[in-house]
Amino acid sequence: MAEENGLDVVVLCNGCFESLWEANESLREEKTREDVNTILKEAGRRYEGRSRVKHVVEVLYEDGMIDEVRRLVKHPLRDLKLAIHYGCHLFREEKGKDIWRKPRQLQELVKATGAEVIPCPLDNLCCGFPVSEVER
């Protein structure tokens, strides 16, 4: 539906971002897209692959919204120190792109609020990581 309206898909949840991003990447393969379009045809739809799946961090940062965030902050969060947990799904990127791009963008967005970003040694681990350590 996004493609039919000339729009990209913007996702807030990291897990949903990865699922939709991976699906979109798979649909770049002609055979997969043909198979999917055979099914979509029954619903009167077709997918051409023109829409991109973007994380909200990309949209806010790359579409020039970071300056708007700075402008809209009326009470800077100067006394707030934040440790960001990116989660592994935020690192999904197109081939050849910098996997640290979105985490850096998120840091800049947090800083735009006036808050300080502090290092966190587990910042890029999967949010499901603690479950894997339960039996230890």
PLM regions and their residue ranges:
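Iron-sulfur cluster-binding electron-transfer modules in prokaryotic oxidoreductases
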Residues: 1-136
